[in-house]
């Protein structure tokens, strides 16, 4: 339970009292997600520091877990990249030390922090995390998508255009939504592979095109510029330190799109063919799923499509 949560016992009684009899069990399970032991933030700060950050830095103090999540991810990436740059020779090839650092980096970055960061960034893309009254708030709010996202295989500056502007506006309906699943056989592994390949191969060109068609010219220009900077940074790091490049960015640039598209395919696997645009018929809510504690209750995907700025 966070610093700003209401009294769970009183709130639970109110929700259960208001529930219809056939909804009561679902509400009981949902309360486990609402008041269960959160696990997004592994690194916690002293309670007084957390309270100060929540009230002085954040636009909504309830978003403190998002901030702590980004802090822990940034600290880990800085630590891991420092080890790679200092312990591995620039001109060195494959070595036991390089393999060891690669394994550790992948385990922590993906197995431990992967869901936490990706879903944290996902919700932060819909919300204003840092209060506008804080100097440099616009830059601070952009850091997860411009800097951190690259280490999870998401090119700088593309996530907002893809997810918020395209996916939610077009509501999973292909062909406007390049990540739409309604045109695929969603019980077919081959269809999943085609879905992933289609997105990975076409997204860099389609997203700016989509923004132009929707007359979001500023976003189109930003997407093209950030993509150019993304590939320039790739080239520069690879030229400077190939091993650090492959450990920190190269591997994730392949795994990231696969993981994201496989996740989206699963979230939009069950669709009502009679009304594929209805938010209640294009995705699911997963109640009391263990991963909800790691992902800001991302299992509540119907709720998210109904109100994308709300964390369930």
Feature-to-residue mapping (PLM):
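Non-catalytic, topology-defining segments of multipass membrane proteins
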Residues: 1-246, 312
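Short alpha-helical catalytic segment bearing the HExxH-like zincin motif
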Residues: 111-120, 249, 265, 297, ...
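A generic hydrophobic-helix recognition signal that picks specific residues
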Residues: 115, 158, 260-261, 290-298
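Small-residue-enriched core segments of transmembrane alpha-helices in multipass membrane transport
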Residues: 250-259
